[in-house]
């Protein structure tokens, strides 16, 4: 039965401008919209009885009502974003737009290094028809995986840059076929390239988190989990490598629950394991699923599941329903009533809980063995959101950065985010996620950061290092454009809106080294490469040390910097000399010290005069420095106080102890004096710097060193050797785990003690050990190390003065 509200919704629904009659899909969409809670369409003023027999008048009434509804939504999106639900936004999407956007999935594949991300992506591309044959990582067949387009990636067998592609997947179930469009990004697993994961997750609507069936949740899995939570990205999980010895998917699920603190349950159980892994049992439909064909491209479903698996499948289905009852109200009600939920109710609950970030369904298979990848793709369609189901906020610069909810409508003013830059043979390629409106070839767009207008000459869809030209891209899609000069994280609009979007989190570099070209004639290419790498990678920093007259590069680890040095040699033909890696030490103080500093230079003519009085003390945390003024009675004017703050900020950039940045220091100025003619902004800036340096050295200064969260995995027979290696480096061992044939050690290590660790680990474990390091926190350096660093700094200063 159609309620009156549904009739009104139906009559007010937007139609295609090229049609004057109602099409069946629009009828269905109208009823779909009206059934959503909080639908605004039911409130439209147009009624079914008001439509006359005139097609032209009918079209004008429909168009005006639709435009009015959209305008009302746009006003509410700006005025009250929290009060506007996604259901209301979805209910007002045009029928044709809904047909497109409801089948779009923007997803990323992320995991710990060597969990099989790129191998799984290769199968996804093959099964969706995007590539004609499968190639493996490490270039074992002289081709290499499609998504690893750089020679370095194929040689080393690791992903260095995130790679974007698109493909179409036809989901088949119970005789029905539905075509979905995936925008897919394969990300690196190594912690040194974590910025690639950050910027991918910033623009994606969902993700596939891959885990190893043997190792379960590993160190980088925890990092990826933290990144997904930072950007509120729903995820399904895929336990890979089910064909490996020691595979235990249920241990991995338990670790998701305990280590990641995210409710998880299997939606499949394996048929066999290790070298006898054959397929999976779908716990929702209770069917056995097998892969056949040379590369597992044929899916065979059987109603009869193996007899010995029935008790396991029934038990795991019960656990799935119980877990859902804890995170979904509808299933909880059914569970409490002791009723059995239908398959559709279970699937709907999984979808609701996954999108609400309360749950992750766990699939399982083996990418390398070509088994059970297709059911995971069905899971992407069933449980991950389309772009209209995700809340995306912008900041309105005209209203003091008030939050605004973006509407995924093609008819609205364009808003997009540039999330990745890449140099190609045709110039700079800028990856853009379109959040609102439509981006068209030849259109003018405005960079919100500098209000600069640029024309979009070409729009392409990327497939690794290949591209396909398109004329326009709608809301919710990802594309790349040429000829747009910008920085990573810039917001683009069509000029109608003064919106900006929050950028991605960029971690601070922890390691530096000096670099210079071996041949001076390569200086031009050297500078060009440095500028490009900085523009593409926000975690790669380049600076010039005026005292040592050296170019310094900084990054996330030894591998990170080594890759850029090697890329410079290959891509720019520049051989470089590098110095010893330098640790990014920090300086701080240990106690409060008061100061009263006078800068006075009066020798005829304009002089300098500035007096600053106050104190310095440790701030609440080692995160940032703080400057405060507590002047009463105007002893120092406002413009001079601004100069004092500038002097403080300059002083913290290079501490007086060993010349490194200062952390966790607070400076308060509460009194001072000025001179009628000799005081200036420069005087107060210099006086503040001098007062800072003097007070700093009197306040028990000490050096801080970066501690790295280190995880080492190796075969069990090498456990003693690995522990010995860590003890030699004064590591603090926090935890250890022993598996079937390997063990894992979790430790905090000083970065300074970890240089060269990889070669020692390889030697101690016959090349079978691996480790990852991630910055943890800064901690007070040992007294002997501080003494050595201070002496080294003072000697370097003395040598420069001699010159």
UniProtKB/Swiss-Prot annotation:
Keywords (A to Z) from UniProt: Elongation factor, GTP-binding, Mitochondrion, Nucleotide-binding, Protein biosynthesis, Transit peptide
SUPFAM superfamilies: EF-G C-terminal domain-like (SSF54980), P-loop containing nucleoside triphosphate hydrolases (SSF52540), Ribosomal protein S5 domain 2-like (SSF54211), Translation proteins (SSF50447)
Transit pept. (range): 1-24
Major site of localization recorded for this protein: mitochondrion
GO cellular component, one term: mitochondrion
Transit peptide in keyword set: yes
GO function terms (MF aspect): GTP binding; GTPase activity; translation elongation factor activity
Pathway as given in its UniProt record: Protein biosynthesis; polypeptide chain elongation
Superkingdom: Eukaryota
Domain tr-type G positions: 102-388
Family annotation (InterPro entries): EFG_II, EFG_III, EFG_III/V, EFG_IV, EFG_V-like, EFTu-like_2, G_TR_CS, P-loop_NTPase
Record: residues binding GTP: 111-118, 186-190, 240-243
Any GO BP annotation: mitochondrial translational elongation
Family under the similarity heading: Belongs to the TRAFAC class translation factor GTPase superfamily. Classic translation factor GTPase family. EF-G/EF-2 subfamily.
Protein task: Mitochondrial GTPase that catalyzes the GTP-dependent ribosomal translocation step during translation elongation. During this step, the ribosome changes from the pre-translocational (PRE) to the post-translocational (POST) state as the newly formed A-site-bound peptidyl-tRNA and P-site-bound deacylated tRNA move to the P and E sites, respectively. Catalyzes the coordinated movement of the two tRNA molecules, the mRNA and conformational changes in the ribosome.
Classification via NCBIfam families: EF-G, PRK12740.1-5, small_GTP
Protein name as it appears in the record: Elongation factor G, mitochondrial
Organism the protein comes from: Talaromyces marneffei (strain ATCC 18224 / CBS 334.59 / QM 7333) (Penicillium marneffei)
Encoding gene, per UniProt annotation: mef1
